[in-house]
């Protein structure tokens, strides 16, 4: 029996980084990006429709933050993805702790740990 499809939703305000994330998963067996957004409201709507297994999100978003999105997912009754991966250009300890408190499983620095996103996805 094969692995079930690894559906991924990406929330990132930078088109270049969003494209880089899509490119990082394109050749992973059974992985498919089912949607993307650059703002909290659009992400909530898209996640509700797509029900992905994995959420990859940035901290800084258009009109809000990744932390706000995670909190809204919880309070709106949206089921939590199997894995939540936060990627940021601001890898401060405060952001790392806030990510953990909001339910993120992984926290990576875009500049030095981008490859770890792919490693996590391959392990799922």
Regions found by a protein language model. Give the residues of each.
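Conserved acidic carboxylate
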Residues: 12
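Short amphipathic alpha-helix used as the core "switch/output" element in two-component signaling
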Residues: 67-80
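Two-component/phosphorelay signaling modules centered on CheY-like receiver
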Residues: 15-35
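Acidic catalytic/metal-coordinating carboxylates
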Residues: 39, 65-68
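Alpha4 helix (beta4-alpha4-beta5 surface) of REC/receiver domains from two-component response regulators
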Residues: 68, 91-108, 112
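Active-site residues of response regulator receiver
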Residues: 58-59
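Acidic, metal-coordinating helix/loop segments flanking the phosphotransfer/catalytic sites
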Residues: 36-54
